[in-house]
Amino acid sequence: MTATITDINAHEILDSRANPTLEVRVTLSSQAYGCAAVPSGASTGEREAVELRDNNLERYGGKGVLQAVENVNGPIRDALLGQDPRSQEEIDRIMIELDGTENKANLGANAILGVSLAVAYAAANNADLPLYRYLGGDGGPFSMPVPMMNIINGGAHATNNLDFQEFMIVPVGAPTFAEALRYGAEVFHALKKRLVSRGLMSAVGDEGGFAPDLPNNEAAFELILEAIEDANYVPGKDIYLALDAASSELYQNGRYDFENNQLTSEEMIDRLTEWTKKYPVISIEDGLSENDWAGWKLLTERLENKVQLVGDDIFVTNPDILEKGIKKNIANAILVKLNQIGTLTETLATVGLAKSNKYGVIISHRSGETEDTTIADLAVATDARQIKTGSLCRSDRVAKYNRLLQIERELNDQAPYAGKEAFLFNRK
C-alpha cells in the first residue's frame, strides 16, 4: 500500500548565527518521517527567492520565522495531506502555485524549502534508502566531491578589514575524500599556528575560517600558501586556492570599492587575472557583481579556459537566469544553494541544466547553517563533484564533512574522489 502524507509540522530552531530558522517534519501513513532544517545567507543575491521573516522587533530583533512556521502548519499542510511523497515535482508545484508569486514571497522560500526537503527525506526513509541513493538512483553515477574549504573569512562573513569574503583551499590532489579532509585539517592547524605566532587574531568567522586583519587581500593568499607548505603539501599540486570575491557587496555606482580604490570592471578583471598568474588559483566565485553582466562577459572571455568562474549571486540557482547566462557565455560554473530557489525540484533542474551545458556544479551551504546535512547527500546524488561547506571547525560545517565520510565508506569504490576531474573549465 502506498504511503501518503498524514502530517506536516514546522517549528522555530536556531541557526549557527543565533537567528531563528525552520525545522520541518513530514510524517507518512507508514509512520516513516523526514526532517529538514533551512539555512540562511548573509550576502544574498537580489534575485533570490524570499526568506520570510516576521519583522517583529520585540522577538529576535525582527528575525523570527513564526509566520513561515504558520504557513507550513496551515495552508501548506492542508494542501499536501494525502499526497504521495514520491511525487516530489507535483508536491513542489502545488506549493509554488499556492504561493502565487515569482519569488515565493507569500509563503516564504524558507517555509516551502523546509517542506520540500522533509518530503524527500520521508520518501527516502520509507524506501529504506539514504537520501543520496533515493535522489541519485541505486546505480548512480556517484562521485565524492572536492571540498572548497573556506579557511580565511572576510567581507560580510567577518568583522575584519578584508574585502573579499572567502579565501579557500581546494585539496585537488588527494586520492580520496577522507584524505582531502585530512589535507584541509592539517593546513587549517598550520594556518592557526602561523596566525598565533604573528600575534594575529585566530577567532573564526561565520563559516569557521579565521578572520585576521591583514595588510591587504593578497596577504591572505600568502599566509595560506605558507600554511600549505608548513603542512608539507605542494601548492598547485596537492592543494589549490579558490576565492569568493562576493563582488556584488563591493559594487556601487558602476565601480568596485576595493582596497580603498574605486575600480572599473576592467580594472577588477585585471586584478583577478594578475592573481591567477601569481598564485595557484583554480576557482573564482562572484568575481564581478550580479548586476555587471557586461563585465562578466569580459571576465569570462579573459579567463574561462584558465580558471573556474563560478556564478553565485548572478545565477541564484535559478534555471531561467542560468539559461540566459549560458546563452551569453557568462561564467563556466554555478554555485547551487537550495534556499536561493526554494524547492528541491527547481534545484535539481538547475543542476541538470548546468551539467548538460558542461558548466561546473558546486553544491553549497549558507553562512547561517544548522546541523542539517542535506547538501552532502545532494552533492553525491547529483554527481556534482564539488562542495562548498565552510572551514574545518564549527559543528554546523563539520557535520557535512562527517556525513560525506559516512557516504564514502558506504559507497567505497562506487564513488571515486573527483579530484581534478571536477574542474571542467578547460574541457568545455
Swiss-Prot record:
GO terms for molecular function: magnesium ion binding; phosphopyruvate hydratase activity. It is an enzyme of class 4 (lyase). SMART domains: Enolase_C, Enolase_N. Pathway: Carbohydrate degradation; glycolysis; pyruvate from D-glyceraldehyde 3-phosphate: step 4/5. GO terms for cellular component: cell surface; extracellular region; phosphopyruvate hydratase complex. The keyword Phosphoprotein does not apply. It comes from the Bacteria. It holds the Pfam family Enolase_C. HAMAP family: Enolase (MF_00318). This is Enolase. It comes from Coxiella burnetii (strain Dugway 5J108-111).
